[in-house]
Amino acid sequence: MRIKSALLTAVLSLLAFSTASAGKHWVATWATAEQVVEPHNCPPAPGLENNSIRQIVQTSISGKVVRVKFSNEFSQGPVTINAAEIAQAATAGASSDIVAGTEVSLTFGGSKSVTIQPGQLVTSDPVKFPMGNRQNVAITMHLGQASSTSVTGHPGSRTDSYLIEGQGSDFSNAVKTAHWYIINAIEIQAEKKARAIVVLGNSITDGRGSTTNEQNRWTDNLSRRLLANKKTKRVSVLNMGLGGNCILQGGLGPTGKSRYPRDLFQQEGVKYIILFEGVNDLGGRGDAISKANQIQDVYKQIIAEAHERGIKVYGAPVMQFKGNNYYSENHEAGRQQLNQWIRSSGYFDGVIDFDAAMGNPDDPAQLNPKYLFENDYLHPNADGYVQMGNCIDLKLFEK
């Protein structure tokens, strides 16, 4: 009888949304790139198993009907969600508080629980959950079986998450950790003109140097500008940056060439792609000229697949790193070669030239000193991320 009841609930849920979905489509309003979480970024005590975690994200564009994706794609064991809720968060991550009366339970095929096998991604049933632009959202999971040493997640959340023992709802004394686990995307049911930008990037896109709980990565600043512009106010921004990521080999997380089919083409409603990778490849061991050529080949493949899907692709030249340990004459020559190709090859539908916008006027091979994060000569600070968000021509996303 329980199985029949769950099936009936699922059918009724689908019927309830069939009218609302007429003439609409799903668009991701928030998403994150995932990997096997490194040991030092794994959940702290009390851990995930048989405990509860509340995670805060800030979405892009508004919606009234949503669904949430949860991922166990990189873990070795199953994850059981006993129950999950979505609610409006009171802050952008500085506290675990939620706005009273906004909690909505999530279901999976009509059931409040779901077990996600290794390698799987699950999507909740659609629910009515009104949220505005740049909405702070809390996703709470009450977990059963779940490893804290082999876990799928996003280490560089730049946002606090909150972990408590047991299956309760009082997070006032929760353990904080600045990582996301298991949550993958939030999608809205939207009118046809709503669409998404997805960015493939590394730690600069992931927001290294931005401020925890302030949501001030360059992609956040771009999103705010898009929302304020009449012709782009229904364009979301999906950040697929991974710290330490390489396109070709090595680095942290799946390589760009292995993850792009999932991180770019499995996102809902994508109309535009921004490719902004390469610095970790060029700055590593080996000949940077050869690497630049190999990166071009990967970019050509991504562009071809995107164009087959009707998606525009914008290239972003690699920013300066003179003064960082990555720098050498060979590495700089590789950067210049790749950047020249991005600007002039004609493969891209447009160029977003962070390199031109962020350079030191007295030494174009170096980041502008006023934009340096901790003088590492690689990552921008919060002001630098504002400059990056501001230098982008919004006309690229108007059609």
Walk through the language-model features, giving the residues of each.
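N-terminal secretory targeting modules
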Residues: 2, 21-200, 210-212, 231, ...
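Conserved SGNH/GDSL esterase-like catalytic core that processes O-acyl groups on lipids
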Residues: 30, 49-55, 78, 82-94, ...
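Surface-exposed amphipathic alpha-helices with a cationic face
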Residues: 299-307
